[in-house]
Amino acid sequence: MVDKVKSDLTVGSIPGHFYRLAIPMAIGMVFYTLYNMAGIYFAGKLSTNAQAGIGIGHLVYFFLIAFGFGLNAAMAGLVGNALGERKINEAKLLITKGISLAVVISIILMVFGIICGPLVINLVSEVGSYREYSVRYFLILLSALPAFLISYTCNGALQAQGDSVSMQRALIGAFFLIIIITPILIFGVPNLWLGIGFDGISLSVVICQNLVMVFLLIQVKRSALGLHLTWKVSLTNFRGNYEIIKQMIPGCMSFQMVIIGSLVVQFALKGFGPNALAGYNIGLRIEQLLLLPILGMTQALLPIVAQNYGAKNFQRVRLALYYCCSAGFVTMIIVYPIIWVFGSSVLKVFTPSSEVISVGVSYLRIDGLILPLYAILFSINSFLQGVKRPASIFWIGLFRQGLLNAFFIWIFIGVLGCDVWGVWVGAGVSVFFGWMLSIFIAYKVANKEIGGLWQKSQI
């Protein structure tokens, strides 16, 4: 049965596996980022306040869908480990339990979001129309939570089998659909329908995400491991649930630390007005697009590490980590001149406001300096998830995003009285110290789990 799985990552060329897995993942994430940027673009056709509102509402929503990313990583790691150990029935059971768990978690999160989401938005925003836009955007998006969590649970199961193409196809389709239906929902059809205005942005996301979920469920059903959903399996074997939750929570919380870090930035920027918030949110989307090469590589690293760790091929784990870190580091060095030269031109696509563009350019040029550090941070996160040490990811995130981010931004803004650029510098300094901690933790974990990082060999 294992031979029918899309790819056995315990044999063959490591760079070849990266090439085959990372490119579809990166392409998929390009369209996922463009999918998210579509909302910012169409909001810009309404007002700067609408853009600022979407930025804040999406961040709070992202805090909840971090559970989806946690489930994705947990499924990729656990199913990949099971396949590496040739435990096919266990891998099948994990997929069933993961999807069932995604349904339960999403219902709980929807209730939590309705109660707490508007309170968080009020905390990081000032009274005004952009706060109202944030709350409206967030509350409608909550109805897409089940689809999002199930989609990424399915994606983790497919990634573990070496399938990175299904999510790519789903996201490409979702992007083209969203750019068609969003303007129709916002502005309507001349002489036929007036549209629903701003709320059409979030409603289009709900529609597209549910279609992505249906497609990925079909792909899991068609995969070698299949989909075996029954009430009996879904409601029993709590050990399976425990293993998934144990792997999910630290990864989820590490994503949430990223959101907390962004909310800290939003909180610091609210005193500079909606133009600063809009500039940051547009700049952040552009930066996410530039990070996609290393995000594709680091997502590919997870199933490679997971399968080889499960098969006790520790030297291949080391080689995969080295390859991902070095290739990502060099790629981000190449990307920075692109930011410097073309950043302003890209921002003009989203807004005509010179103040918004100025803020966005300053963010991209300062934060762009630390992009190579992100390559190593993300690589280490995938390595830790693959060797079943996701709790370490949380501690790195808490230290970097939760503590140092707030501390250094306060130093530059509150103590030194810097302008908006002080927020970017403070966040950058926190990334540097988080990078140092991640290297230290990776070294310690590698010594315990795979016999160290520094054994010599050739890829």
What are the functions of these language-model segments?
Residues 1-22, 79-146, 188-249, 305-370, ...:
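Short alpha-helical transmembrane segments in multi-pass integral membrane proteins
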Residues 9-41, 45-46, 62-74, 78, ...:
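N-terminal transmembrane alpha-helices
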Residues 20-39, 140, 151, 174, ...:
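Transmembrane helical elements of multi-pass membrane transporters/channels
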Residues 25, 29, 40-41, 77, ...:
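Transmembrane alpha-helix boundary and packing residues in multipass membrane permease domains
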Residues 30, 34-52, 121-128, 184-195, ...:
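Helix-terminus/linker motif at the lipid-water interface of multi-pass membrane proteins
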Residues 48-59, 138, 202, 274-289, ...:
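Small-residue hotspots at the loop-to-helix junctions and early N-terminal turns
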Residues 51-115, 148-167, 280-343, 374-396:
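Small-residue-rich hydrophobic transmembrane alpha-helices
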Residues 72, 76, 141-159, 167-178, ...:
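Short runs within selected transmembrane alpha-helices of multi-pass transporters and secretion channels
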